[in-house]
């Protein structure tokens, strides 16, 4: 016969530790184990792109450890906001999305979205960031970042092309204008194909863009020169080049961050379990090498830190967009 003992603070602490050590294989004593069915992975970008490739890489490996397949659904359009709007409709704790943070931190200021970025979506796990390359075309005679600043102080100015109005690169241009007072002229494109063609044809001075195959090819051909990069550290591909942060332009030293997201009604236990699985994979040399081959830097973060980073970027972007007079289009 077991004699019942009164609950003491020590007993409660021991019980809590025991529950924590038991893992997160169940959401609670009364609920079914998680995951209990295939996991739906929304990628708000076209099939075959970097976001799609990375989402499938993680899905294949996490399916092995979690015991349920990942079913990828590509739902591109409207700056990835269509896919994110689809995400918030789910309430089964088995639906996630993968992509850039811009549909949460930037796009809501520039276009109508069918969700509140901070209330309807829960950041789950940061995966990686991609630096922005500051590239000079053959139209720009200078060789260094100092040459860029010197020309920006003249009436000639410096034309800076980006992949579009309201993009991260556009925000960088506005930050450079504010930091230097220089004559930087933004040249926004719609899509990448014409941008690549005009970069090869030297139709502007500078180009701000994340590294990807066509850009890398133009660099190898000598039609583009990398003057600087962005990020908390120099990317492995360009260790000899300074970041904009090193050059004294912290507010323009921006990167494209990517991660996993869930509807805000997803149980915290599930969010934490998913984050732990992502961090486990990011700690492996195989995953690190695969991401670096795609010109991305692994960037694991806790749920709390990833959430805080997104909230911070959302607030900062709102202030800058208002001051720069960037309007929704």
Mark where each language-model region is.
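An extracytoplasmic/periplasmic, membrane-proximal ligand-sensing/linker region
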Residues: 36-38, 220, 246, 268-329
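N-terminal twin-arginine translocation
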Residues: 2-14, 18-33
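Ligand-binding pocket segment of bilobal, Venus flytrap-like solute-binding proteins
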Residues: 159-165, 169-241
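Hinge/capping helix and adjacent helix->loop/strand transition within the periplasmic-binding protein
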Residues: 89-94, 109-194, 244, 257-290
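Immediate post-signal peptide segment of exported/extracytoplasmic ligand-binding proteins
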Residues: 27-41, 91-94, 149-158, 220-223, ...
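C-terminal lobe and pocket-closing loops
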Residues: 129, 214-283, 315
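N-terminal (or domain-start) structured segment
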Residues: 30-120, 165, 169, 181-208, ...
